[in-house]
Amino acid sequence: MDELPPELWIKILSRINDSESLARCRVASKTLNSLSREVRAVNLICTWSRYLKSRSIVVVTPFKTIFRSLIENSSKIRSISVGVDKALKGMSFDDFNEEDSKDLYLTDVEFVKEWLPRVREDLENLSISDFWIQSCWRKSDILALISSNCSKLVKLEVKNAWLSVVGLTEMPNLRYLTLEFIRLDDENLEKVNDCFPFLQELNLIGVGGLKEPRIHFLHLKSCHWTVSNAPLSLAIVAPNLLELKLKCNKPKSLLVETPKLVQCHLSVEDAEGVSFGEFQDLKTLELVSPDMYRLISNISFGNKIKKLAVDSVKSIEQSERLELGLATILKAFPGITSLSLSPRTWSDIETHFQSQGGLGDMKGTDSLKQITARVQMSDHTNVHQTVSFIRSIVNKYRGLTDMRLMIHQDKDPRVRSNLISTCMMSNPRVRWKWGMWAEGGEDMWV
């Protein structure tokens, strides 16, 4: 041990992700005990097994006590991650009597006051994942405490808590903010917009308490927003946003003004109130909606999209399923080179093909090079219909060079083999790639 220089030992100790393991290293030798104080990160998770022990007759050191000890035995901490294991997230109030407990209430201001002043000068990253059963009915003022103490904080992540914004002050150095499964007392996100003016990445996952939220950041580059059912009016105004992942249900109004957007994933149930500003550089687009026909027919996503993924999930009405054809998609996105289709979308456009007796009169595009699809076939007789559909696609779109098709893994192997051999023999100019898919499973290429 003495042969290694201290700097190397500090690097080794810094790679230990679990601070409990680091604590055991301290006990192992005086040298490690001394050097471990130079580690700049504290990472502590309350596991399921530790939780069960704390509820048994076995005497264990309280989780908060261990955490405070780790803070006290370290110097110049730059990163802190403390939380409960994901396995505890699914617990219900009936599982254990947690009504009066606070031992895992990690956004408790009084608890945070015990350790935050010690690390405030150097702290750059802070992640707190609370225990929902103890935190959901206790409003926390932790945001005000953090903003008044941590001037150098660059990255903040809070999960599973009820947060107040009273007393929250501006944090000009914060660049990354994640709020996940949070009840937030900021109905329109006004405080969030005002106090984090230089955010570059924003993740709002399952944030409740919102009414008419409006995201307005001049420097934002990436945004992931999963919206609950409650808000009826949503707005994103971010002139420098490059990546957007937005999932919402049925907003009466959705305004998106992000002219520099390059990559977008949009999931929406009802497209009636959706309004987008002009996209100058949008290259990659993924759409998930049962209202797909109206979404792609009524909204302009720009003419620079190269990669498109379409998932029409369950269509609202049978009549709308019949309207969604391949020509409809390619008319809306004439310049795409790559098209990915979900099982439902493949089924919809094949149904449209069969009902119309072909792909339609629209001129085939030469830009489309690759189609990736999860193929739906209900029975053996559908193989011939599917082959006819595929052959028509390949013949009409002459620029198409790659067909990547996955067949459901429960499909009869003979049916699968018949489809593969027929397609490859009748269309030799195309490069074929075959695979299998299953609901909830990973795609497997063969």
Curated annotation (Swiss-Prot):
Record SUPFAM superfamilies: F-box domain, RNI-like
Keyword Nucleotide-binding part of the UniProt annotation: no
Domain F-box: 1-51
InterPro entries for the chain: AUF1-like, F-box-like_dom_sf, F-box_dom, LRR_dom_sf
LRR repeat residues: 59-84, 103-130, 135-160, 181-206, 223-248, 265-289, 318-343, 382-407
Record keywords, A-Z: Leucine-rich repeat, Repeat
PANTHER family linked to this entry: OS05G0510400 PROTEIN-RELATED (PTHR31215)
Protein name: F-box/LRR-repeat protein At4g29420
